[in-house]
Amino acid sequence: MQVRSFLKFTLAATALAAAGLAQAQAPLPAGYKAEYKMSLVVGTAFPWGKGGEIWANLVKERTQGRINIKLYPGVSLVQGDQTREFTAIRQGVIDMAIGSTINWSPQIKELNLFSLPFLMPDYKAIDALTQGEVGKQIFQIVDKAGALPLAWGENGYREITNSKKPIKSPEDLKGMKIRVVGSPLFLDTFTALGANPTQMSWADAQPALSSGAVDGQENPMSIFTAAKLHTVGQKNVTMWGYVADPLIFVVNKDVWASWTPADQAIVRQAAIDAGKQQIAIARKGLDEADKPLLKEIAALGVTITQLSPAE
């Protein structure tokens, strides 16, 4: 009897294992790729990249592995050229992305709206734009331009840093070499302020800061801390909140069409959920009254200048 019971148990266990293996090795639906490529400017040490990781993980979990996403930080799918990212999404070189409205503005001029100086004075203003009617209209424009937008994220307010001196007025910027992103609006803004702006990709920015080829840059504080910009001479930060940098979660249209309606719904909701989490991460330490992130940065030996509304 013991032998018979043992055999029954062994056969049952083998059958369960085989069933589990068959389920794990179930073929993908027709038209699905084994892996989808997600483009990001920065890696998962940054709130932006963390948003990509959260989105990918949620999608994999909720689709039970039918949709597997690999992250490609550093805009590596387009050799680091941030301004080519949207075109590559439209062409199918990139399957998915979380991209900056700034980087995509050369192809979608309406996205320059978000780069107008001092348009969004606080987080409530950002939310009013992105989560309201304007945000819906922007999504329609992005859709018409060739990619399917699903959710909003956020890089943050772009504050200016430099290796020379505290900046309190345009006079302090005169002649200063500032790295800016590849949008003509940023060139015009910093030229008008008297600086000497230089466009370059993020991949080139840190070596340029380290060598002194440029004096400063402008980016959210989460970028400053994650990239440890205080180690490349950036010892002065001016909090002026002149431009906020929303992010958009998108999918290539052909890729989207290849998925079942059920999986489309999963990917969309995962993007929305990831976007909310990513925004919370990007604002952490800055939306509290005492701004603890600024205290952490000051403790690194960085001089922080906070401009008054009049300034």
Report the location of each language-model feature:
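Active-site-proximal, glycine-rich beta->alpha crossover segments in alpha/beta enzymes
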Residues: 129
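N-terminal secretory/targeting leader peptides
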Residues: 5, 25-125, 134-136, 140-311
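N-terminal export leaders
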Residues: 3-10
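N-terminal signal peptide c-region/cleavage motif recognized by signal peptidases
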Residues: 19-24
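Bacterial N-terminal signal peptides
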Residues: 10-18
